Swiss-Prot record:
GO annotation (BP), single: cytoplasmic translation
Gene Ontology cellular component list: cytosolic large ribosomal subunit
GO molecular function list: RNA binding; structural constituent of ribosome
Pfam families in the record: Ribosomal_L15e
Source taxon at top rank: Eukaryota
The protein's name: Large ribosomal subunit protein eL15
Keywords: Ribonucleoprotein, Ribosomal protein
Family that this chain belongs to: Belongs to the eukaryotic ribosomal protein eL15 family.
Keyword Calcium belongs to the record: no
């Protein structure tokens, strides 16, 4: 087995004494750092390589932490229109997953880069930590590489904001195939709109 295979087997057993100790140390370290920061290297090189990262110019890894739990509805100045102040505010579940939120925040922080993918690196009682793989579309190493230069096209600007990354597609339900999958494409809202629309076709 190669070195990455051994790393992969270590990460499979996250509750082992070794991994729980390493994760406890790393989450402590990540809490001391800024919420979004550039990582000098990947914490999980095997996972990063699987998701498309190459250790060469043009690629970057940013680390981000996201608060765990649900999402409160943002209410301007506490205006709730006669209802109790917390009704319809708390206990709401966000439609997207936290990994998708992490990608979005990193994408807004470094808009000149393109989000390729992301992966989990740790969590504690309050936060989840993710590392996001980004590619620089203006770098020659990316533009001249036929395996990655598709991301340089303008259609892939801010793909993380449009649910086009792996985490975004999962949140949209696009990993489902077969029975009951037809109501998910092209999107839930678009499919619903098409089903509500009365179409009176004229045949000539």
């Amino acid at each position: 087995m190669g070195a990455y295979k051994y790393l992969e087997e270590l990460w499979r057993k996250k509750q082992s004494d070794l991994m729980s100790f390493i994760l406890r140390l790393r989450t402590w370290e990540y809490r001391q750092l800024p919420v979004i920061h550039k990582a000098s290297r990947s914490s999980r090189p095997d996972k990063a390589r699987k998701l498309g990262y190459k250790n060469k110019d043009g690629y970057a890894i940013w680390r981000v932490r996201v608060r765990r739990g649900g999402r409160k509805r943002p209410v301007s100045k506490g205006i709730v229109y006669g209802k109790p102040s917390s009704v319809g505010i708390n206990q709401l579940k966000f439609a997207r997953n936290l990994r998708s939120c992490a990608e979005e925040r990193v994408g807004k922080r470094v808009p000149e880069l393109r989000v390729l993918n992301s992966y989990w690196v740790g969590q504690d009682g309050t936060y989840k930590f993710y590392e996001v793989i980004l590619a620089d579309p203006s770098h020659n190493a990316i533009r001249n590489d036929p395996r990655i230069n598709w991301i340089c096209e303008s259609a892939h600007k801010h793909r993380e904001l449009r649910g086009l990354t792996s985490a975004g597609r999962k949140g949209r339900g696009l990993r489902v195939k077969g029975h009951r999958a037809k109501s998910l494409r092209t999107s839930r809202k678009g499919n619903w709109r098409a089903r509500q629309m009365l179409k009176l076709r004229r045949y000539r």
